[in-house]
Amino acid sequence: MRIPTSADIACGGNIIIRIAIKNSDIFILQPLRFCILPWFIARKRSPDSCWWQEYENYPPAFLKPFLFSSGYDQSQRRSRHRAYMHINQLASDLFWNAEFIPAIVHFFPEHRIFQIIFAFWREGFFAAPEARTGKKYRVIDIKPHRHCGTALRGYFQFVRPKPNEWVPVQQAWQR
């Protein structure tokens, strides 16, 4: 697995982002390098919803796929956009969209960090998981594409048995 260089990104039009879940209730979506994508911060507003806000000046057409258009508020001005989604719907939409995007997923159960790196427009950079979501159990099952070589596979379920606590139900590494 090769990490893209600045020349790869400059000439290949790649966009790389990282999503991490830590401290149990904060999502951080940030660019891996060069600030290609803006920062998104989602904080828990209620047990069943997240709040996404973006602070950079990017066109709404560019931001809409990342804000999951079902909650996109086009009335916001100066590139401040909000989306309200159910936690499980947010995860489901994220991985159904990721099905069409080359990506690699990392699980760090000891630190409770969930990271996914997308590489747009250049499949050769990362192994490409194929996302499937178990609607009944709300389990996200990430499977590698056969033609992309090795990839990671993991199971992650968002449940809230206690207030302000996120629990990874099952996590596994597979090379």
UniProtKB/Swiss-Prot annotation:
Name of the featured protein: Putative uncharacterized protein HobH
Organism: Escherichia coli
